[in-house]
């Protein structure tokens, strides 16, 4: 019942921010002033709640629910619609609405609606969309060339808050989320025991550092693959947006803060590696325990020892990091060390005739971190790509030539919507100077063939989705926000590679609209980032499933708790298979809803299993960060 009350409140009332402070965020977007101050905000007039760059398309979506939990909340818009300046209410544009798809109900949301195009408004400032007949308005938004830069900083700071064994102290952490270093006590990460030989003190290892994987505080080598590669790829694509001022302890050291953050993770991965080049699989606990805050958890920590999946995973991550770190003179020694470690891991992996696929028994909670042999071999191609980039050794080029069609782009449409590091590595390889020209041509032709095949993955198609951000219904699974962001990243690859210059605007628009979906242009009218009120959101995710920000604590709810969760965490997203994943069928929403409404803003644990909907992950985060970074310049 509590969950139903929360979602009703979310849809009917304007949310008041509870968390955050001036130290954590920039000044919020100005609210309507003067005679406009009393105009109510409604979740039926949807815009990107942060805003738009001046020359980008700008289209508000006006929603009218037809099916689902909110079907009784009908909305009949007036005409004309206006864009008003927030500071004084001046009307800067007045125009008509366009019915979406001739008034049809969009099946995946259960809504019909209208579009209001205000792309002609380009002057920087704060605005809102106004329905005069209903005396209702959208969220206030900014038009500014750098409107997404502060959002990028907030999203990247999630990794700082996820650091294990590191103090979260002011001025780098807001007062609400100050915490002592976690897992530095006796028999914890600095003295982790082998879970397969728990009493053998000779196998105690220092495995401190790294990032908490998700809403739990465990650390997985194989789960780090996507975020490490994707963050490095994001930096390579748009280095100028990743500046040295993201308010982490390393800020101002002359190295971009994204690189500092990735190095925090690779430093831990180095501790996971054995002298023979192999790597341990994961670190965590053998009991389920809350950690609110993480420093309060004093349980002993254990590791799963050497496994071929972890070994080939670190080979790729070390090689990629070596390539990127090598461009910084201050990190030349680190780059050389990572190169040697990547080579050692590669050799160890290649020496194993029968790859290990059952290393993780589940004794260390919670997620199973094994890879099957097919996935290990695919990640070996990724490792070979980056090893070739840093060595020019033909051994690695030969391996890529022989095995590149084992990568995800050849198993699925959409190239990089899943296992994004594989598709992105292949495109990176095609751009290296000493690659076989025939293979380069073949890879780019295969990418273009994927684009030409369509499958509703590439390019903006107006009739596909009322909310302008189509993904297939099959992608509304646990973690749907991950492929959603990667649909955008795959479209932007087409632009970067200039594969279809005549149609370039369609790919950019598709990616932009997917970003706007994250920022509130969706059936919930909610920003899919936690507690973003200090950054100007009118309605953002208030609760996420995370052991630190757990149900009933001072960090539980951005509306009603003392603090709420830290800003900028990307939750898993709508999940039409929620009941299969443990959510009770009686809890509706998220159960029994159209795909886009298969979401509930809550964080209750067992037996409601909110982790299948609202748990964040370092891999969801990296997909969103990469997408956002392309527009933060």
Residue ranges: model-predicted function:
Residues 250, 254, 258:
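Acidic, glycine-anchored loop motifs typical of Ca2+
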Residues 33-39, 137-176:
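Low-complexity, Pro/Ser/Thr- and charge-rich linker/hinge segments at domain boundaries
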Residues 17-38:
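Bacterial Sec-dependent N-terminal signal peptides
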Residues 405-413:
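Solenoid-like repeat scaffolds
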Residues 258-276, 303-356, 396, 400-403:
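An active-site-proximal structural segment forming one wall of the substrate-binding cleft
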Residues 45-135, 160-225, 229, 267, ...:
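Aromatic (Trp/Tyr) and acidic
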Residues 7-17:
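Bacterial N-terminal signal peptides
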Residues 1-7:
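Bacterial N-terminal signal peptides that target proteins for export
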């Amino acid at each position: 019942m509590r969950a139903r009350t929360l979602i009703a409140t979310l849809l009917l009332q304007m949310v008041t921010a509870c968390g955050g402070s001036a130290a954590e965020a920039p000044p919020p977007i100005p609210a309507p002033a003067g005679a406009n101050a009393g105009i109510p905000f409604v979740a039926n007039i949807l815009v990107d709640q942060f805003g738009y760059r001046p020359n980008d398309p700008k289209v508000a979506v006006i929603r009218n629910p037809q099916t689902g939990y909110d079907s009784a909340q009908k909305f009949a818009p007036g005409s004309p619609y206006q864009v008003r300046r927030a500071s004084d209410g001046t009307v800067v544009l007045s125009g008509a609405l366009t019915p979406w798809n001739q008034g049809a109900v969009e099946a995946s949301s259960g809504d019909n609606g209208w579009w209001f195009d205000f792309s002609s408004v380009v002057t920087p400032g704060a605005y809102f969309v106004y329905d005069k007949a209903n005396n209702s308005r959208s969220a206030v938004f900014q038009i500014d060339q750098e409107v997404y830069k502060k959002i990028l900083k907030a999203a990247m700071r999630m990794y700082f808050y996820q650091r294990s064994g590191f103090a979260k102290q002011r001025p780098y952490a807001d007062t609400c989320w100050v915490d002592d270093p976690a897992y530095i006590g006796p028999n914890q990460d600095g003295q982790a025991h082998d879970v397969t030989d728990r009493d053998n003190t000779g196998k105690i290892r220092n495995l401190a550092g790294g990032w908490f994987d998700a809403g739990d505080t465990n650390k997985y080598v194989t789960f780090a693959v996507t975020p490490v590669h994707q963050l490095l790829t994001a930096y390579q694509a748009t280095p100028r947006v990743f500046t040295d001022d993201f308010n982490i302890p390393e800020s101002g050291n002359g190295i971009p803060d994204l690189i500092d953050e990735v190095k925090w993770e690779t430093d831990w991965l180095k501790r996971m590696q054995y002298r023979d080049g192999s790597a341990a699989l994961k670190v965590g606990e053998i009991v389920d325990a809350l950690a609110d805050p993480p420093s309060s958890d004093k349980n002993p920590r254990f590791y799963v020892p050497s496994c071929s999946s972890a070994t080939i995973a670190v080979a790729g991550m070390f090689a990629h990091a070596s390539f990127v770190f090598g461009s910084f003179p201050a990190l030349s020694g680190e780059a050389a060390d990572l190169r040697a470690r990547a080579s050692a891991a590669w050799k160890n992996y290649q020496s194993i005739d029968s790859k290990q696929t059952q290393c993780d028994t589940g004794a260390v909670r919670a997620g199973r971190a094994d890879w099957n042999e097919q996935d290990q071999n695919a990640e070996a191609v990724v490792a070979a790509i980056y090893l070739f980039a840093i060595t020019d050794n033909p051994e690695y080029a030969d391996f890529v030539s022989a095995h590149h069609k084992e990568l995800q782009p050849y198993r699925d449409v959409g190239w990089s919507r899943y296992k994004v590091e594989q598709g992105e590595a292949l495109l990176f390889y095609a751009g290296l100077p000493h690659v076989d020209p025939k293979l380069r041509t073949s890879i780019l032709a295969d990418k273009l063939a994927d684009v030409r095949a369509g499958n509703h993955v590439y390019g903006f198609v107006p009739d596909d989705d009322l909310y302008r951000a189509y993904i297939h219904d099959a992608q509304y699974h646990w973690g749907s926000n991950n492929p959603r962001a990667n649909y955008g990243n795959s479209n932007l690859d087409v632009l970067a590679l200039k594969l279809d210059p005549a149609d370039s605007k369609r790919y950019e628009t598709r990616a932009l609209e997917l970003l706007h979906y994250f920022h509130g242009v969706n059936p919930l009218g909610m920003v899919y980032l936690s507690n973003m009120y200090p950054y100007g959101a009118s309605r953002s995710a208030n609760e996420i499933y995370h052991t630190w920000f757990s149900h009933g604590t001072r960090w539980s709810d951005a509306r009603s708790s003392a603090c709420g969760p830290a800003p900028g965490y990307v939750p898993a997203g709508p999940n039409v298979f929620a009941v299969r994943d443990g959510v009770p069928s009686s809890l509706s929403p998220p159960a029994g809803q159209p795909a886009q409404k298969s979401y509930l803003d809550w964080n209750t644990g067992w037996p409601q299993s909110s982790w299948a909907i609202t748990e964040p992950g370092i891999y969801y985060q990296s997909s969103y960060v990469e997408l956002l970074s392309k527009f933060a310049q």
